[in-house]
C-alpha cells in the first residue's frame, strides 16, 4: 500500500491511498465465503459454493464491492498511522479508481488535530482580584444560620415582605382550572421571588382567609409561558421569630460554646471559600494568559459539535426548570444573538484550551495509573450524586473511559502550568495555589477522596495511558 497526505488547512488533510490488488485477496476470499453462506445453489451445500459459481449467480461486481467495503476502512487506518495523523471526525471517503485485477485508489478527507507551537509556559504571570471579606458578609452568614433555627408565629395582621404565608394556588384559563396547575397548603416567604410573576405583589396586604386573583404566566407544564389567571387563598400569616444571638444559640447551632467562637468559625469558613474562589480565578487567568501567546487553529467540526452539545444542555436545563428561553434571555438581559455569540466565544476558548493542554500533556509525557483513574471516577460520581461503582460500570460499558483519561491528562497539564506561574492579587501579593489538586481542580486537602472508597477497575485500565489519546 502507498499513501500520501495533502494538507488542506491546519485542521484538515486529504489522504490519497493506493492498494495493490494482491492486498485485496484476503477481503475477496472473505467476501466469497460470506456470500456462499447466504445463497442456495442446487448441487452445492450452503457455504460450499465455489467462487466461479458465485460469479455467475451473484456477479463478480457484488463480490468486489463487498471486498472494497471491507478493505477501505482498514487501509484508511493504516494510512493515518503511516502519516502520523490524528483524526477528529469521520472521514469523507471516495473511491477514485478501481477495476478488477487492478490497484484500488481512494481519497479520504478528514479533520485532524492541529499542530501547535507551544510557547514557554514556565513563569506565566497573571493577576486576580483581592480577596474581599467584610463584617457584613460574616453577619449575613450568621443571620442565615439564625433563620435556620427560627420559629414561625401566627399573626393576625396583613402579610408584609419577609412574612411567611400558608396558601393555596389555582391557575385557570377562561374560567377553567388547568390540570396540574394548583398547589395546596404551601408555605411561602413573601418577597422570596422565583415562583410566579405577580405572586409577591398579590400577597402583600393579604390576611388569613383572604382570596385574590392576579394574572401571570405558567413556568412549567405543557402550557409553559402562557398567560393565566391565578387565584391565591391565604390560610395563615406567620412572622419569623429569630433566636437571640447569644452563647446559648451558639451551643445549640454549632459545636462552639460562645458567639465569638461561632462568628470566628464563620469568618474562617468564608475566608477559605474566598481563597478557593481566588485560586480558581488564578488558574483560569494563567490559562487565559497562555492562550494569548499561542495561535490554536480550531477544527470547525469540533466547534460545531461542542456548540450543539452546550446549546442542547442549556435547553434541557431550562425545560427541567420550567423556564422558556425567552424568559431566560429576559432575566439575563441578553438578546438571542448576544446569547449565541457569547456561547460561541466560550466554546472556542474551551476547545482551544483543550488542544493546548493536550500538547502540554504530550510534551511532559504524562500518564495515569489505576489509582488516579479510580480517584477521578469516584470524584465524578460524588459530584453527580451517583454510586461510584455504578458510575464506573456505566463509563466502561459506554466506552467513556478515554474521555475521563483525557480529562485527567488535561488536569495534570493545567496543574503543571499553574504551579510554575506567578500570580499576584490587585495589591501585589503572591497568590498561594496550594489548594490546586494534581488533576487541575481546586479543593481543600480534606476534600480529597477518602482512601476507603474503592471501585473495581477493569484490567485494561491498569496500564499507564499516554497523553496522545484522541480528542
From Swiss-Prot:
It holds the Pfam family FKBP_C. It is an enzyme of class 5 (isomerase). Keywords: Cell cycle, Cell division, Chaperone, Cytoplasm, Isomerase, Rotamase. GO terms for cellular component: cytoplasm. Its EC number is 5.2.1.8. One of its GO terms (molecular function) is ribosome binding. SUPFAM superfamilies: FKBP-like (SSF54534), Triger factor/SurA peptide-binding domain-like (SSF109998), Trigger factor ribosome-binding domain (SSF102735). One of its GO terms (biological process) is 'de novo' cotranslational protein folding. PROSITE patterns: FKBP_PPIASE. Residues 436-471 are annotated as: Disordered. It is found in: Cytoplasm. Residues 444-471 have a biased composition (Acidic residues). Residues 162-243 form the PPIase FKBP-type domain. It catalyses: [protein]-peptidylproline (omega=180) = [protein]-peptidylproline (omega=0). Belongs to the FKBP-type PPIase family. Tig subfamily. Consists of 3 domains; the N-terminus binds the ribosome, the middle domain has PPIase activity, while the C-terminus has intrinsic chaperone activity on its own. Involved in protein export. Acts as a chaperone by maintaining the newly synthesized protein in an open conformation. Functions as a peptidyl-prolyl cis-trans isomerase. This is Trigger factor. It comes from Nocardioides sp. (strain ATCC BAA-499 / JS614).
Amino acid at each position: 500500500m502507498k499513501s500520501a497526505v495533502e494538507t488542506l488547512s491546519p485542521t484538515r488533510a486529504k489522504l490519497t491511498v493506493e492498494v495493490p490488488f494482491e492486498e485485496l485477496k484476503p477481503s475477496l476470499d472473505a467476501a466469497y465465503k460470506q456470500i456462499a453462506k447466504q445463497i442456495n445453489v442446487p448441487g452445492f451445500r450452503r457455504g460450499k459454493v465455489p467462487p466461479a459459481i458465485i460469479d455467475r449467480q451473484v456477479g463478480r461486481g457484488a463480490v468486489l464491492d463487498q471486498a472494497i467495503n471491507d478493505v477501505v476502512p482498514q487501509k484508511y487506518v493504516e494510512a493515518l498511522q503511516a502519516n502520523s495523523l490524528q483524526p477528529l471526525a469521520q472521514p469523507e471517503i471516495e473511491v477514485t479508481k478501481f477495476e478488477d485485477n487492478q490497484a484500488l485508489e481512494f481519497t479520504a478527507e478528514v479533520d485532524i488535530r492541529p499542530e501547535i507551537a507551544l510557547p514557554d509556559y514556565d513563569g506565566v504571570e497573571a493577576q486576580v482580584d483581592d480577596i474581599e471579606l467584610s463584617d457584613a458578609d460574616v453577619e449575613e452568614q450568621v443571620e442565615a444560620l439564625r433563620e435556620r433555627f427560627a420559629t414561625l408565629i401566627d399573626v393576625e395582621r396583613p402579610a408584609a415582605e419577609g412574612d411567611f404565608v400558608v396558601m393555596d394556588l389555582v391557575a385557570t384559563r377562561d374560567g377553567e382550572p388547568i390540570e396540574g396547575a394548583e398547589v395546596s397548603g404551601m408555605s411561602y416567604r413573601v418577597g422570596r421571588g422565583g415562583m410566579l410573576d405577580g405572586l409577591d405583589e398579590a400577597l402583600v396586604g393579604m390576611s388569613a382567609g383572604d382570596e385574590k386573583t392576579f394574572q401571570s404566566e405558567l413556568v412549567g407544564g405543557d402550557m409553559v409561558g402562557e398567560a393565566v389567571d391565578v387565584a391565591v387563598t391565604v390560610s395563615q400569616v406567620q412572622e419569623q421569630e429569630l433566636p437571640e444571638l447569644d452563647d446559648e444559640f451558639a451551643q445549640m447551632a454549632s459545636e462552639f460554646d460562645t458567639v465569638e467562637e461561632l462568628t470566628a468559625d464563620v469568618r474562617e469558613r468564608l475566608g477559605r471559600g474566598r481563597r478557593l474562589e481566588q485560586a480558581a480565578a488564578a488558574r483560569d487567568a494563567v490559562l487565559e494568559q497562555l492562550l494569548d501567546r499561542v495561535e490554536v487553529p480550531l477544527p470547525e467540526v469540533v466547534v460545531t459539535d461542542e456548540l450543539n452539545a452546550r446549546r442542547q444542555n442549556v435547553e434541557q436545563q431550562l425545560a427541567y426548570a420550567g423556564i422558556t428561553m425567552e424568559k431566560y434571555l429576559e432575566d439575563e438581559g441578553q438578546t438571542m444573538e448576544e446569547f449565541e455569540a457569547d456561547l460561541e466565544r466560550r466554546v472556542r476558548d474551551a476547545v482551544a484550551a483543550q488542544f493546548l493542554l493536550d500538547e502540554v500533556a504530550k510534551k511532559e509525557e504524562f500518564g495515569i495509573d489505576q489509582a488516579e483513574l479510580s480517584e477521578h471516577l469516584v470524584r465524578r460520581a460524588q459530584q453527580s450524586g451517583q454510586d461510584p461503582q455504578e458510575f464506573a460500570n456505566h463509563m466502561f460499558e459506554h466506552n467513556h473511559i478515554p474521555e475521563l483519561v483525557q480529562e485527567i491528562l488535561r488536569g495534570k497539564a493545567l496543574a503543571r502550568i499553574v504551579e510554575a506561574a506567578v500570580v499576584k492579587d490587585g495589591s501585589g501579593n503572591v497568590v498561594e495555589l496550594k489548594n490546586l489538586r494534581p488533576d487541575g481542580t481546586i479543593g481543600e486537602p480534606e476534600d480529597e477522596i477518602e482512601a476507603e472508597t474503592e471501585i473495581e477497575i477493569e484490567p485494561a485500565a491498569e496500564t499507564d495511558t499516554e497523553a496522545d489519546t484522541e480528542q
